[in-house]
Regions:
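Conserved small/polar residues in nucleotide/adenosyl-binding loops
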Residues: 1-2
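Flexible loop/turn segments at secondary-structure boundaries
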Residues: 13-14, 42-46, 72-74, 109-111, ...
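Thiamine diphosphate
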Residues: 18-26, 32-120, 312, 432-448, ...
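Active-site cofactor/cluster-binding pocket
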Residues: 28-40, 44-260, 331-336, 617, ...
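A structural-propensity feature for long, helix-poor, extended segments
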Residues: 67-105, 209, 219-220, 465-515, ...
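Glycine-rich ThDP/TPP pyrophosphate-binding loop and its adjacent helix/strand module
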Residues: 114, 556, 570-576, 585-602, ...
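Short internal beta-strands
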Residues: 123-129, 452, 603-607
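Ferredoxin-type iron-sulfur electron-transfer modules and their immediate structural context
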Residues: 192-196, 205-360, 367-575, 626, ...
Length: 789
């Protein structure tokens, strides 16, 4: 009888899979295969694209390149697969038996089997922060054995240090590319240097002479700094047990059996049975907390003596890796770490800022915003801060989050609440995630999220990493992603579905109140309270806490029916989240439909002014003069005013915010938007890696502040409830801008300076138009703010 068989799937349920044997090399004679392991946004993929072009353009060799990477915005795993040879290459698959392997990320030697398949006599290049002796000491045993037994040529280079010294930050790509050409000797090295520098001029010429010269220096340094390591003879006697991932037994079974293998690039080896009970695609929350990627070069160190306990560092952290904790005297003493006495409302507790170094991406936004006279945070090498990981684990597990202050009272108080959005795969210094994190702290335990496809969905729900998590009661955000174009409608449907369930609860209560003889008068009174309060999150939560035990004690049929739906007693906080490509462009029709519905949902548009997820294409949010894909000569049409359009309904709460400019305004807007009994729209300014910010993403918060102070962005909110009180519903929250700073602001971002280099005459015209447009918009807001009511 005919049976379907599968190859590449371990089917231990229907037993129809065929086993796959050992890897064999099918490359044609003379074909050179190379494999490069990199980190998302470190430039490895781009460098290898240039390398294959150089080889193809300067020799008669056939060339092929494949690139593989995960969906993290940056800081994720990447691999580059290069082949070149004298015969046509007909290998439509990734490199599995390379002649050359380069590991650009030092920590990968402990995470992945980077030497797997490397041919005997091949070459291995490692970016190591240590000298040769220390590198040899720290290599895993299986690597030592493999290097020795297969007579591998082993090279190291401290590209991390060189990049830092040259001002390239974490971009080691050019240095490692130069080292590859020095070792591989595919073409004469001096010719490779010449071609690399030509490619640099072409790639970075528009970004300025300084960038070009830094990369020139990186090329020279990469060739000079390569060190060949002599492999000790005794390594050959080490038993090669292969790469073994040691799992933490305390991790949940789902993490150990599914998440860790996928993170370790072993996901294809998972058997079908591992997914039993998860056929619908449901995924556990909070799995990002188990990644512990350790990708930062430098992470913050807390200077306890300088800290003024403002908690601003925690508020702006894009990945929720730095948090304030409160402890009793006994808890602090038992922890074995240093605490200081709390201030103000927390004066009866010990206070500590704790960092999770292995989750940090090293953006240093926390250092940037620290207002202390002497910074309470300084960046230090990751290795020096690894002991802090034990402190983090201990404090989270044994001390936790104390609800001793009202989190809705101030920004400082809010930071003592657990973020229910943590350790996402967003870029270091991401301008979007602090907004989502703040919402999760305010409303996370009752939060439902419909997420548009884009950056926000990629870092929020890419298997196996889920940053949305739960509190100690198992409460947390419910998250789902439909499509790019229908997210607003999808979120509205979530809200309508929940309210239908709550209608059933109300019907049961009304029937119980009218005719149940088992329900006490007191219980019926509380049911009446719930019916009156069902539209309020806070009040419905307070009433539900009293109602549930009373219904459990009653046990009548009405109460049983209601208890089956008790998860819906507390009003949910429905959020619809996406970027400007969604909110301004592709999903705008849906956004308008949802706002017009008048229903109680909240929309957050994180505005990067480009399609960030797909590489920086122009959107209707892109301002005049900005260079983006599809607007390479500068955008010619002014930015769409999404907030002004929404205000025309008159019954929509609308606000424009920037966390870098006013932390308190954002805090107040989020509370008001959630409390407003109708649709709300919050538009948040989000500096992005696509902007090419001078100084890098370490300046995210400062950029948000400068954007408002110069008039590039404006803070305001429109609350229809104020009109009901006889007040002007439109409130301008930012001061009059200093327009003299406007041009300086533009010149701090490559998306504007590149236009000046390419089209200087047009640039002057467009920059002037951009300033005039910003003034026009500000003046229109001022007219609204001055209207009499």
């Amino acid at each position: 009888m005919y049976k379907r068989q599968t190859v590449g799937i371990v089917d231990d349920v229907t037993f129809r899979s065929l086993p796959v044997g050992e890897e064999i090399s099918l490359a044609k004679p003379g074909t050179f295969e190379a494999l490069f392991f990199g980190l998302g946004a470190d430039g490895t993929v781009g460098a290898n694209k240039n390398s294959i072009k150089i080889i193809g353009g300067t020799t008669n060799k056939y060339c092929q390149a494949y690139f593989s990477y995960d969906s993290k915005k940056s800081g994720g795993y990447t691999s580059s697969h290069l082949r070149f040879g004298d015969l046509p290459i007909t290998s439509p698959y990734l490199v599995t038996t390379p002649d050359f392997v380069a590991c650009h990320v030092p920590s990968y030697v402990d995470k992945y089997d980077v030497l797997k398949g490397l041919k005997a006599g091949g070459s291995f290049l490692l970016n190591s922060v240590h000298d040769a002796a220390t590198t040899c000491e720290t290599l895993p045993a299986h690597m030592k054995a493999y290097l020795a037994k297969n007579k591998i040529n082993f090279y190291i280079i401290n590209a991390t240090k060189i990049a830092a010294e040259l001002g390239l930050g974490s971009r080691t790509n050019t240095i490692m590319q130069s080292a590859f050409f020095k070792i591989a000797n595919v073409i004469p090295f001096d010719k490779a240097v010449e071609q690399m520098k030509k490619a640099i001029q072409k790639s970075y010429g528009k970004k300025g002479e300084d960038i070009v010269n830094m990369n020139y220096a990186a090329v020279d340094a990469g060739g000079d700094a390569v060190v060949k390591v002599e492999i000790p003879a005794e390594w050959a006697s080490i038993e090669d047990k292969g790469f073994v991932h040691v799992s933490d037994a305390s991790c949940p079974e789902f993490v150990r059996k599914i998440v860790e293998p996928i993170n370790g690039l072993k996901g294809d080896d998972l058997p079908v049975s591992a997914f039993t009970g998860r056929e619908d695609g449901t995924w556990e929350n909070g799995t990002a907390a188990y990644e512990k990627r350790g990708i930062a070069v430098n992470v913050p160190e807390w200077k306890i003596e300088n800290c003024i306990q403002c908690n601003q560092c925690a508020y702006v952290c894009p990945h929720a890796v730095i948090r304030p904790f409160l402890a009793t005297e006994a808890e602090a003493a038992a922890s074995g770490v240093e605490w200081k006495q709390g201030l103000g409302e927390t004066k009866d507790y010990k206070f500590r800022i704790q960092i999770s170094p292995l989750d940090c991406t090293g953006c240093s936004n926390c250092v940037d915003v620290c207002p202390a006279k002497e910074k309470a945070l300084v960046m230090k090498p990751l290795e020096s801060q690894l002991p802090q990981q034990r402190n983090w684990d201990y404090i989270v597990k044994n001390i936790g989050y104390k609800q001793v202050v009202d989190k809705t009272k101030s920004v400082k108080n809010l930071q003592f609440a657990q973020p229910l959005f943590e350790f996402s795969g967003a870029c270091a210094g991401c301008g979007e995630t602090p907004y989502i994190k703040a919402i999760s702290q305010l409303f996370g335990e009752k939060m439902m999220v419909a997420n548009a496809t884009g950056c926000t969905s990629i870092y929020s729900g890419s298997a196996p990493s889920t940053p949305y998590c739960t509190n100690d009661k198992g409460q947390g955000p419910a998250w789902a992603n439909s499509l790019f174009e229908d997210n607003a409608e999808f979120g509205l449907g979530m809200h309508v579905g929940v309210e239908k369930l709550r209608d059933r609860i109300q019907e049961s209560m009304e029937q119980a109140i009218a005719g149940c003889t088992k329900c006490s008068d007191e219980l019926k009174g509380v049911m009446q309270e719930w019916i009156a309060a069902r539209g309020s999150s806070a009040k419905s939560a307070e009433v539900s806490a009293r109602l549930i035990p009373m219904m459990e004690a009653c046990g009548c049929d009405y109460c049983k029916d209601i208890l089956e739906m008790k998860d819906w007693l507390v009003k949910k906080s429905q959020w619809i989240i996406g970027g400007d490509g969604w909110g301004y462009d592709i999903g705008f029709g849906g956004v308008d439909h949802v706002l017009a519905s008048g229903l109680d949902v909240n929309i957050l548009v994180v505005d990067t002014e480009v399609y960030s997820n797909t590489g920086g294409q122009s959107s209707k949010s892109t301002p005049v003069g900005a260079v983006a894909k599809f607007a390479s000569a500068g955008k010619r049409i002014r930015k769409k005013d999404l907030g002004a359009i929404a205000m025309t309904y008159g019954y929509v709460y609308v606000a424009q915010v920037s966390i870098g400019a006013s932390q308190m305004q954002l805090f107040n807007v989020l509370k008001e938007a959630e409390a407003y009994p109708g649709p709300s729209l919050v538009i948040a300014y989000a500096p992005c890696i696509n902007h090419g910010i001078k100084g890098g993403m370490t300046r995210t918060q400062t950029v948000g502040k400068e954007a408002v102070s110069c008039g590039y962005w404006h803070l305001w909110h429109y609350n229809p409830q104020l009109e009901e009180q006889g007040k002007n519903p439109f409130v301008m929250d930012s001061k009059e801008p200093d327009w003299s700073k406007f041009r300086d602001f533009l010149m701090k971002e490559v998306r504007y300076t590149s236009l000046k280099k390419s089209f200087p005459a047009e640039a002057e015209e467009l920059f002037a138009a951009a300033e005039e447009n910003a003034k026009w918009r500000y003046n229109s807001y001022q007219r609204l703010a001055k209207m009499e009511y």
